[in-house]
A protein has these predicted regions:
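Membrane-proximal basic amphipathic "stem/tether" segments
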Residues: 1-11, 24, 184-187
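Flexible, glycine/small-residue-enriched loop-and-beta-strand segment within the central core
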Residues: 3-6, 25-37, 42-133, 164, ...
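Flexible glycine-rich beta->alpha loop in the catalytic core of nucleotide-sugar glycosyltransferases
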Residues: 88, 95-96, 138, 149-150, ...
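Beta-rich strand-turn-strand
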Residues: 119-120, 129-143, 149-152
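Conserved G/P- and acidic residue-centered "switch" motifs that form tight phosphate/ATP-binding loops
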Residues: 145, 163
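Conserved beta-strand-loop-alpha-helix hinge in the C-terminal portion
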Residues: 157-159, 165-180
Length: 187
């Protein structure tokens, strides 16, 4: 995997990029002025980050794996220590599927009914491969989402969720909070 140089990253015009960031030069970044990236972030090949007016905020110690996408007009926030597995799609905007309106971004907005709502991915959240996160969803601290899940509702802290749509199946361990403190103490 080849990563962009510091000069290449600066030329893209991000709102902010922290230290020790590895941004694939095979990923696509749109509206970089609305994208903030913290420290110790890795974004892999073939990811798409398309920031709308709400922007995208990526915290510290975050990995976004291959073929994942963060797209929409609403704000998308990834808090510290998130792991977004491959082929995850996070949407902050949605077309109207009722048939009462036309769809897709090539159609003038007066004929469409796009809705947008913020998506908040809490600290220490892990989202499994192939999952879809819909607009307006908040995943609280420590949530784990199993592979191939559809997240259409908020998920409570330290829950493990799976399915289409997701349902909570059990409690997730909290040892990672102690490990976070150890990591912070070692820096």
């Amino acid at each position: 995997m080849a990563f962009s140089t510091e000069d290449q990253i600066k030329a893209m015009g991000f709102c902010h990029v922290g230290e020790n960031c590895l941004l694939s030069n095979k990923a696509s970044y749109y509206n970089c002025k609305n994208i903030k990236i913290g420290n110790n972030v890795r974004i892999d090949d073939f990811c798409v980050l398309s920031a709308g007016i709400g922007g995208i905020e990526i915290g510290n110690y975050i990995h976004i794996a291959v073929y994942s996408s963060l797209i929409g007009a609403g704000k998308i926030v990834l808090k510290d220590f998130c792991n977004i597995s491959s082929k995850v799609a996070i949407y902050s905007s949605n077309d109207d599927y009722s048939g009462q309106f036309m769809t897709n971004p090539t159609v003038p907005s007066r004929y469409t009914n796009v809705t947008s709502s913020d998506v908040i991915i809490g600290k220490h959240v892990i989202i499994g491969s192939g999952s879809v996160i819909l607009p307006g969803v908040t995943l609280e601290i420590g949530v784990a989402v199993g592979a191939l899940s559809l997240v259409n509702k908020n998920c409570s802290e330290f829950g493990i969720y799976i399915g289409t749509p997701v349902k909570r199946i059990k409690e997730r361990g909290k040892n990672l909070l102690e490990l976070e403190e150890n990591l912070k103490g070692s820096n």
